[in-house]
């Protein structure tokens, strides 16, 4: 006989929230302007997306939501707005032009920290 917990038929185990997941933080981040457009005086032409930083990361794991920064689609994926250098399309050119994506975390956290939910 095993010592497993007994669940009623059809009952689901309670869902666990993954560590590092903060939906309220990401919701606030989506309301912000692109940090790259803001820093470099560019016009934001596409919606803001949450970019989970990749520079300085040494695994395939996504960084926690608190390490995400607001980027327009053009600076992030570059699939719809091709007028900008997109991090996921041209990572070396993006890094040369704008620096490390991790450099924008502190400013993002400061702005979101001043918001009230």
What do these predicted regions represent?
Residues 72-75:
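Zinc-coordinating Cys/His ligand positions in small cysteine/histidine-rich zinc-finger domains
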Residues 1-47, 88, 93-101, 105-117:
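A boundary/linker detector
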